[in-house]
């Protein structure tokens, strides 16, 4: 499986809330960084932190960029977020960029950037 397909599968597991499958794709002692500098070491920690922010969220995964640097492959996924906030109001079109560093076939780093908070959609009632 090529690197972009690996990340697409990982992101689909996230949308399907198959957290154990996601974690199996992560390297030991991996690093997950979210907006605001929030750091996690497991997908379970990340999902637990996200509870209470929205009812559900998914991604329109528009493009992937792949680069290789020695033993590491970096995959960047660009697209938009859509979902439903806690008040039941749908949202769509929120920009995101996810960067993944893969080493030995496992995700070593996941860095997430998005406009979710800036958009104000989580506060709409």
Task: Label each residue range with its predicted role.
Residues 109-125:
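Low-complexity, intrinsically disordered terminal/linker segments enriched in charged
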Residues 19-24, 28-73:
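A solvent-exposed, acidic/Ser-Thr-rich amphipathic alpha-helical stretch
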């Amino acid at each position: 499986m090529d690197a972009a397909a690996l990340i697409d599968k990982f992101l689909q597991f996230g949308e399907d809330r198959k957290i154990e499958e996601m974690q199996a794709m992560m390297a030991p002692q991996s690093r997950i960084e979210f907006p605001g500098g929030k750091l996690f070491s497991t997908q379970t920690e990340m999902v637990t932190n996200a509870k209470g922010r929205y009812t559900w969220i998914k991604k329109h995964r528009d493009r992937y960029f792949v680069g290789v640097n020695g033993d590491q492959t970096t995959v960047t996924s660009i697209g938009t977020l859509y979902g439903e906030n806690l008040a039941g109001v749908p949202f769509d079109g929120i920009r995101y960029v996810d960067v993944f560093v893969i080493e030995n076939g496992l995700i070593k780093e996941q860095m997430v950037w998005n406009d979710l908070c800036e958009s104000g959609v989580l506060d709409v009632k």
